[in-house]
Amino acid sequence: MGRFLFASLGLLVVAFSLSGTGANLYCPFDWLSYNVSCYKLFYSLVTWDQAQRFCVEQQENSQLASIHDVGESVKLSNYISQRWGFFDVWMGLRLSKRNGIWEWSDGSNLTYTSWKEGEPNNLFNMEFCAVLSAGTRYLQWNDKKCTLLHPFLCQFQPRSEANG
């Protein structure tokens, strides 16, 4: 009985340690797996709208990336910083002209923010799209004119092993 209990406890610990790691996800070869999503940095310098269209074409349910907590922010900061360091990077956050609220392109709720000090400032009433700021190692956000050219980060939720 003691061995069975010990083995069961060990399996439970392994299961909990793997949960949330993306260990059971199928991300394409060159995409980062984190939590329940896959991410990829694209180096083409494009407008926010072009980046969003490109992401949608890459994978089923793909969008520009949305960031929902500090852990995800740090993971993506490290990922981008290891590959890039020159330009700000588009993410999926955009100011709705309809209601003046910042919204994620994937429709998820804006539950976490990491704006640079004094941002968003909507300079000259022309900054409706958000970037991960190169000057903060991609940890903080800035609002920018949507027609500026930047690399971008796509995200999608893959099928799990069980659903594959």
Swiss-Prot record:
The UniProt record gives the binding positions of Ca(2+) as: 127, 142-143
Chief location bin: secreted
Entry-linked Pfam families: Lectin_C
Q: In which tissues is it expressed?
A: Expressed by the venom gland.
Q: Got any disulfides in this one, which pairs?
A: 27-38, 55-154, 129-146
Name all C-type lectin domain ranges: 34-155
**What are the annotated GO cellular component locations?**
extracellular region
Keyword set, alphabetical order:
Calcium, Disulfide bond, Glycoprotein, Lectin, Metal-binding, Secreted, Signal
Q: Where is this motif: Mannose-binding?
A: 119-121
Q: InterPro entries from the entry?
A: C-type_lectin-like (IPR001304), C-type_lectin-like/link_sf (IPR016186), C-type_lectin/snaclec_domain (IPR050111), C-type_lectin_CS (IPR018378), CTDL_fold (IPR016187)
- The regions listed as transmembrane in this protein's record are none
Q: Where is the signal peptide?
A: 1-23
Keyword Nucleotidyltransferase assigned to the entry: answer is no
- Asked if the Swiss-Prot or TrEMBL record annotates the protein with the keyword Metal-binding, the reply is yes
UniProt GO molecular function:
carbohydrate binding; metal ion binding
Coiled coil (UniProt feature): none
> Where is carbohydrate linked to this protein?
35, 109
Cellular compartments annotated: Secreted
Q: Which family does it belong to?
A: Belongs to the true venom lectin family.
Q: What does this protein do?
A: Mannose-binding lectin which recognizes specific carbohydrate structures and agglutinates a variety of animal cells by binding to cell-surface glycoproteins and glycolipids. May be a calcium-dependent lectin.
Q: What is this protein called?
A: C-type lectin 1
